[in-house]
C-alpha cells in the first residue's frame, strides 16, 4: 500500500442522545448502513478480546461509583454542619445560635454515617483489588500470581455491581440531607444522582454482574477462590480479635468528621 486514502466508509454520527445525566459525555446515534467492517484478530475470538476491555472498564465504573458517592458525601456533610434548623433532642448544642445545625438530628446523622462507612470501606476494597491486579501481573511466584488473578476476577463483578448500587443509594441519601434544596439544580446534588445512575447500567448491567458472580466466578473453580477469601477473612479476624473495643463515646467524637 502506498498510503493513498481509499473511499470513505459509510459511517456517520447522525445526532446526539439526550440523556438523564453525564451530559459532558457525548452519546451519538451512529449510522452503519453499507459500512465495511474489518475483522480484528482471529474469527470467533472477539468476545474473549472484548472482555479484556470490559473487565477493566467495570473496575473503572466501580471507581466512578465511589468517586461520585464521596463528593456527594463531602457536600452533604458541609451542608449539614452549616444549615441550622431545630434543636437536638438531647439538648441545645449551640446556644449562641437560633437553632442547631441539622447535623445533630438523628436521621441526618444516619444518612451521613451510612455514606461515610460505605465510602471508607469501598476505598479499602478498591485498594485491595488494585493490589491483586498488580500481584497477578508482577508477582514472581506463579502460584501466588494465579491466586491473585483469581481473587481479582472474583471481585470484579462485586466492585462493579455492589459499589455502583450502593454508590447510587449514597448519592440519594446525600441529596436527602439537603431536603428541598437537594431537588433544586443550583445546589448540584441532583446532578450527582443523575450522573451516577448510568453506572448501574453500562459495562454490563448490575443484574448481569450478579449472574457473572454466581454463575461463573463462584463456580469456575468449584469455590476454591471463595474459600481462599474466606480463609483470609478468618485470619484477619484472628489477628485482631484481641484488639481493645472502641468505645461508643470515642465513635461519637469522630463519626461525622470529614
Question: Could you describe each region identified by the protein language model?
Answer:
Residues 249-256:
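Conserved small/polar residues in nucleotide/adenosyl-binding loops
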Residues 245-247:
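Acidic, proline/serine/threonine- and glycine-rich low-complexity intrinsically disordered segments
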Residues 1-242:
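Internal glycine-rich alpha/beta core junctions
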Amino acid at each position: 500500500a502506498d498510503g493513498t486514502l481509499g473511499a470513505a466508509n459509510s459511517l456517520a454520527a447522525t445526532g446526539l442522545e439526550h440523556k438523564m445525566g453525564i451530559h459532558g459525555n457525548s452519546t451519538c446515534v451512529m449510522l452503519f448502513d453499507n459500512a465495511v467492517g474489518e475483522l480484528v484478530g482471529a474469527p470467533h475470538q472477539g468476545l474473549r478480546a472484548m472482555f479484556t476491555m470490559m473487565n477493566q472498564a467495570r473496575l473503572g465504573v466501580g471507581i466512578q461509583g465511589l468517586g461520585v458517592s464521596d463528593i456527594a458525601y463531602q457536600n452533604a456533610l458541609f451542608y449539614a454542619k452549616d444549615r441550622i434548623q431545630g434543636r437536638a433532642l438531647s439538648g441545645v448544642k449551640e446556644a449562641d445560635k437560633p437553632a442547631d445545625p441539622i447535623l445533630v438530628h438523628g436521621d441526618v446523622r444516619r444518612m451521613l454515617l451510612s455514606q461515610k462507612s460505605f465510602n471508607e470501606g469501598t476505598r479499602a476494597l478498591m485498594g485491595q483489588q488494585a493490589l491483586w491486579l498488580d500481584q497477578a501481573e508482577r508477582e514472581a511466584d506463579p502460584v501466588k500470581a494465579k491466586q491473585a488473578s483469581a481473587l481479582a476476577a472474583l471481585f470484579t463483578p462485586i466492585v462493579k455491581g455492589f459499589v455502583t448500587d450502593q454508590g447510587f443509594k449514597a448519592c440519594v441519601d446525600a441529596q436527602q440531607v439537603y431536603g428541598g434544596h437537594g431537588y433544586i439544580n443550583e445546589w448540584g446534588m441532583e446532578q450527582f444522582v443523575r450522573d451516577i445512575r448510568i453506572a448501574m447500567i453500562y459495562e454490563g448491567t448490575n443484574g448481569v454482574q450478579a449472574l457473572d458472580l454466581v454463575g461463573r466466578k463462584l463456580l469456575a473453580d468449584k469455590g476454591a477462590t471463595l474459600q481462599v477469601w474466606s480463609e483470609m477473612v478468618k485470619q484477619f479476624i484472628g489477628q485482631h480479635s484481641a484488639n481493645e473495643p472502641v468505645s461508643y463515646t470515642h465513635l461519637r467524637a469522630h463519626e461525622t468528621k470529614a
